[in-house]
Amino acid sequence: MTPALHLEILDLRHFSASYLKPVLEAESRVWDQRLRWDFHASASLLLQYLDSRLLPGYVAIENGRICGYVFCVYESEKALVGDVFAVPSVTNPQSAADVERRLLEHMIELLQHSPGVDRIESQLLLRPHGTHTETLRNAGFQIYERLFMELDLNSASLAGGPEGGSTDGLELRTWRDNDFSAAGHLIAQAYEGHLDGIINDQYRSVAGSLRFLHNIVRFPGCGLFDPSASRVLAYRGREEIAALLLCSRVREDVGHVTQICVSRKYRRRGLGAWLLADCSRALRLSGFQALTLTVTRENTDAVALYHRSGFVTRQTFDAMVWERRGGVRV
């Protein structure tokens, strides 16, 4: 911690939305500059929760001014650290990371000493990989490096289609509201034994996958869901799904892939590239400039697919997971 930095760390629930609004406005600018992401819808939703005074978390106060915050949400025996952010200082850029570290330490201490919490997850997109490694490792977290990747839709070739093997029984179409159940089953099956099921335990069951889908489609945390750009490879005449790509609008001219997965039966046939290309073509026709996605670096097959499709890494960040020893594991 910078010696001149004197902070108070106080309960977030003591403050109404108006006190946090300047910090969220500063954060919105960082999201746009760094990730081309319009954060205003997420900020508006967060402000509503702040006014309810029910959101667990902390604020950092320096010289009487709120300069950062952290919050979490609970899901059964799991806590999700939804965000941590401190306003960057022009004179001391490192101070923001120091403030965030203090906030994370308080949040983690609270959660690890909460008897009902057996698991903590978070993905800190705004902070480059390694920013808070020491704090997280000291607290017993596993850290997984993830990539935030971007495709320039103006220069991409957008070529892609099935390779080898018959796909005659499949129909490529846009997302429908009645796809929820089939999509939940596909996600749980596709991620069985997968690294990303360690990072996000919702992928480990159909019920968890349906909660994930509900959050993606109904809430603006990962942008505004765009069914016209989302793609489904469905079995003709059946309700099952062989592959899917879900896309949200994170800025008026930027789409974001919130989920892409392929049934084990149809892997290595070019279906992932096909979904990406078809989604990208639809976005470009609608005037979009870019498509983004996130992927775990250790997921080498997926990283290679995205590179072949023209994606480049815009930023790296950390996903973090902590589980209580002897706690309930799914």
Regions found by a protein language model. Give the residues of each.
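Conserved active-site alpha-helix within GNAT-family acetyltransferase domains
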Residues: 126-145, 273, 297-315
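A short beta-loop-alpha structural element at the N-terminal edge
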Residues: 3-24, 171-201
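Conserved donor-binding loop and adjoining core beta-sheet/short helix segment
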Residues: 35, 40-111, 245-254
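Conserved acetyl-CoA-binding loop-helix of GNAT-fold acetyltransferases
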Residues: 93-109, 262, 268-285, 304-308
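C-terminal "cap" of GNAT-fold acetyltransferases
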Residues: 145-171, 289, 294-300, 309-310, ...
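Active-site rim helix/loop that mediates acceptor-substrate recognition in acyltransferases
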Residues: 33-57, 201-237
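Acyl-donor-binding surface of acyltransferase catalytic domains
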Residues: 1-3, 77-78, 89-170, 176, ...
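Conserved beta-strand-loop-alpha-helix junction that forms the acyl-donor binding cleft
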Residues: 120-131, 264, 293-303, 320-326
